[in-house]
Amino acid sequence: MKRLKDAISKGEILFFGAWEGDALVGCCSITVGFSTFDYMPSGTFEDFFICPDFRHKGIARQLVQFAYKSSPISSMTVACAQCDIQMYKSLGFSIQLGSLFAFEP
């Protein structure tokens, strides 16, 4: 938990929310890293959720765009399950960068 708190306090993980009055109806985070490709900060989009009653109303797209524009990043990627690819494409993640593999020691 301390490592998470430290990362948040250093701005390495940024959290964003979508609100309807006092109710949190959506959230996401961006983990900030550094891209050696373009020598700029880059972000990994994570922790994405929209409450079921608020889906298909444009909130997800607004949240993604707000998070990107509010972050100090020049690019943003997301890793997702095959079943979520179309959703992320509809939200603006349109450049496929090959395949992602997780290392297992």
Where are these regions (language model features)?
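Conserved GNAT acetyl-CoA-binding A-motif
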Residues: 70-81
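Conserved acetyl-CoA-binding loop-helix of GNAT-fold acetyltransferases
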Residues: 50, 56-69, 90
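Conserved beta-strand in the GNAT
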Residues: 15-17, 23-32, 44, 49
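Conserved acetyl-CoA-binding loop of GNAT-fold acetyltransferases
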Residues: 89-99
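A conserved beta-turn-beta hairpin within the catalytic core of GNAT-like acetyltransferases
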Residues: 33-45, 55
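Residue-level recognition of the GNAT/N-acetyltransferase active site
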Residues: 33, 51, 81
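Active-site rim helix/loop that mediates acceptor-substrate recognition in acyltransferases
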Residues: 1-15
